[in-house]
A protein has these predicted regions:
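Small-residue-enriched transmembrane helix starts and helix-helix packing motifs
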Residues: 1-16, 93-105, 128-135
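Juxtamembrane transmembrane-helix termini in multi-pass membrane transport proteins
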Residues: 9-58
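Structural signature of hydrophobic alpha-helical transmembrane segments
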Residues: 11-21, 65-74, 134-140
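Divalent metal-coordination and catalytic microenvironments
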Residues: 21, 51, 79, 104-106, ...
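Membrane-interface helix caps and helix-loop-helix hairpins in membrane proteins
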Residues: 57-68, 86-90, 114, 186-188
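Membrane interface segments of multi-pass transport proteins and intramembrane proteases
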Residues: 62-66, 86-90, 149-168
Length: 188
């Protein structure tokens, strides 16, 4: 059972249905270069710990938040990260705090999916939630590793200044996040 939930967590992140999560990771990580991989790993870990905490609290029905509201807040976290990228272009020390706060919101979003998955199951934190979250962390590390290496080599080509690349990618992601905000807000 452990390995099954580890796989589900891993592939849940890499699924096209989790595009909002992948775009969040993209704009969260794009400001880090290859030499800052340890800092990025800490940011991802803060995100995952917070994500895991809110996910567990929601799955165990300790907290309940309107799922439709959470679905609006998720793209809002993406938009805020894009705006942050436009303003600063480099990672800031408080990125780890923002990642943690945003992880709480994203975890609540995943909890709705998992509640459907766990219908009729006895929820055991160590057999279900822990491996699911480890799978999420592994997928995030894989995604961000590939991203950082691709961006590093793209930057070496000197086709465009890296700060402009950050702005262009952040702009496209910001537009998509605004579309999600409007669409999801209309569903509340």
């Amino acid at each position: 059972m452990f390995f099954e939930f580890l796989q589900q967590g891993f592939f849940h992140i890499l699924d096209i249905g989790a595009l909002d999560h992948l775009l969040f990771l993209l704009v969260l990580g794009i400001v880090y270069d290859l030499s800052q991989w340890k800092k990025l790993l800490w940011v991802l870990t803060a995100f995952t710990i917070a994500h895991s905490l809110s996910l567990a609290l929601s799955i165990l029905n300790i907290i309940n938040i309107n799922a439709k509201l959470v679905e609006v807040l998720i793209p809002l976290t993406i938009l805020i990260t894009c705006i942050e990228n436009f303003i600063y272009l480099t990672p800031k020390k408080y990125n780890i705090i923002l990642a943690g706060i945003f992880g709480l919101i994203h975890g609540l979003g995943f909890s709705n999916t998992l509640k459907e998955l766990f219908i009729g199951m006895d929820i055991n934190l160590f057999q279900t939630l822990l491996p699911f979250n480890i799978g999420i962390e592994l997928a995030q590390i894989l995604f961000m590793s590939i991203l950082i290496f691709l961006l590093h080599y793209f930057n070496k080509l000197k086709l465009i200044a890296y700060c402009n690349l950050v702005r262009i990618i952040s702009a496209f992601v910001a537009v998509q996040s605004m579309v999600w905000i409007v669409t999801r807000f209309n569903n509340i």
